[in-house]
Amino acid sequence: MAGLGGSQIPDGEFTAVVYRLIRDARYAEAVQLLGGELQRSPRSRAGLSLLGYCYYRLQEFALAAECYEQLGQLHPELEQYRLYQAQALYKACLYPEATRVSLLLLDNPAYHNRVLRLQAAIKYSEADLPGARSLVEQLLSEGGEDSGGENELDGQVNLGCLLYKEGHYEAACSKFSAALQASGYRPDLSYNLALAYYSSRHYALALKHIADIIEHGIRQHPELGVGMTTVGIDVRSVGNTVVLHQTALVEAFNLRAAIEYQLRNYEAAQEALTDMPPRAEEELDPVTLHNQALMNMDARPTEGFEKLQFLLQQIPFPPETFGNLLLLYCEYEYFDLAADVLAENAHLTYEFLTPYLYDFLDAMVTCQTAPEEAFIKLDGLAGMLTEQLRKLTIQVQEARHNKDDEAVKKAVNEYEDTLEKYIPVLMAQAKIYWNLENYPMVEKLFRKSVEFCNDHHVWKLNVAHVLFMQENKYKEAIGFYEPIVKKHYDNILNVSAIVLANLCVSYIMISQNEEAEELMRKIGKEEEQLSYDDPDKKIYHLCIVNLVIGTLYCAKGNYDFGISRVIKSLEPCNKKLGTDTWYYAKRCFLSLLENMSKHTIMLRDSVIQECVQFLEHCELYGRDIPAVIEETLEEERMHIGKNTVTYESRELKALIYEIIGWNM
């Protein structure tokens, strides 16, 4: 049937062919045939009706609404077309138009309840929760012949949705759970319940219902290809079919990704996104596109920004999009872009940014041009949040004293939410002093916040870093670095390489060389095992540890040992040379060359020869390795031939020859 045109269909077979295409869910082909037929008979009721149905199934709701509008004009006595038009307009997010059309049917008893349900859905989508609740309660109280067990169930589900939107997650869970028990398994209800559990932080229960949705989806619809992309099988798009929508698989995988992301299981979050049924990028729904942008930001930031910017032009877009785009601009220090987006979308700030988030972003944007003013703004936010934290601490204590478990849980959740707001404010303040290399003031800030943050992983890590940077507090730094490393000791490569390097340096600086060597042996063993399991994978942890140690000795003026350590850390070059490792290595070489040019140090010929040989190896293996990772959204790109390790290693070698007076 592929490519079948209207002219190829035998006389009298047209209707049968169209119905077969619809039966087989080949709606796009049916649309082509019906479009051709309607050019010949533009007033055909059957043609317009089938075309509207096909457009609706293809989720082309605006086009479906046009078909039903024409039918309503051609056959005003058939009011069902107005209802279909209103439903299609609602699905197209054209809420005022949908409301206007639905009001024309309100006085018709045959459609009264269906119109009320549609109007409740419209008000819910417009965030008019009181209006939606009034209509839902009216439906539940009215009853009538159109009412019954199913409508009662729908009413309870609708109340659950309203409770969820109002932030009453536990009450919403009760409604959805009761509805699920009454109806038996339904993917949409299971998803609603999982979402309510997620929002009330019952992640295990949410994951249980997500697993149910996925299990049912795989068993009932193996053709949807769940998990195929993750295991590397090349599969074609399953499209945005009604079946896919009915399974709630896309929603379930997105929610699983959100939970794993919240729990900082980032690999599992990415897996959840690739496990969902495969679709082409242009077929992706806004939530999936948003989540892809966020979860692949570290690996593909340019693509992530493009996706979020694209979503911002769509109506509607996930409500988190606006805030997340602005926060990411600030994280990547594109403060000008953040300021532009805020200025160009002032109408969105009131709808999508909380007062806290707006004030925080305003302070972050100010950091670039007026750090002192930004610090004052951040300090105001910090003061407000610490006051809230103290009040919530008292509430938790009182609830525990009264043995009120529900009140304890509510207060603890509020405390954790407030702390997650406070940490970024504190870190933004600290960064202002950090950029000025005023490390004692950073430490002072962290000490002031110890009563709230002493158990927070971000706070502990940054305290360790600021103690390390002061060069006379290595022992205190060890006290913060060690618990981080010991927590992941069995999977030590899950710890950031710079944390391991700083801990080793701290050991060395207080003469605990045995501890440093033991840690390095542990890293080496894990790298060997990983290299055995995956020979092509580049692993840089031990390399970076040695580079940092080598850098330390160079900084202390012991270039003979320091440079040799740097060179050995990058052996073999074909496995250890990368943008990050080259960054550390070239800093040591530049420092060495500067001191040699000033005649403040003398190197043995054997060390110079070792340096030249090392740079030649870098030249050989660095052709495809960027010397610098360019700014994600930088308009002026570096020359492609100059931004390589090969080019920079040649420059360093030429400088060595020039300084020591060798002929090249």
Curated annotation (Swiss-Prot):
The record's keywords, sorted A to Z, are:
Cell projection, Cilium, Cilium biogenesis/degradation, Coiled coil, Repeat, TPR repeat
The Gene Ontology terms for molecular function here are: intraciliary transport particle B binding
GO terms for biological process? intraciliary transport
Where is the protein found, in the record's own terms?
A: Cell projection, Cilium
Q: Which cysteines are joined by disulfide bonds?
A: none
Asked if the keyword Protein biosynthesis belongs to this entry, the reply reads no
Q: Where are this protein's TPR repeats?
A: 11-44, 45-78, 153-186, 188-220, 385-418, 423-456, 458-491, 543-576
Cross-referenced SUPFAM superfamilies, in alphabetical order? TPR-like
Chain's role: Required for polyglutamylation of axonemal tubulin. Plays a role in anterograde intraflagellar transport (IFT), the process by which cilia precursors are transported from the base of the cilium to the site of their incorporation at the tip.
Family the entry assigns: Belongs to the TTC30/dfy-1/fleer family.
Q: What is this protein called?
A: Intraflagellar transport protein 70B
Q: Which organism is it from?
A: Bos taurus (Bovine)
Q: Please name the gene that encodes this protein.
A: IFT70B
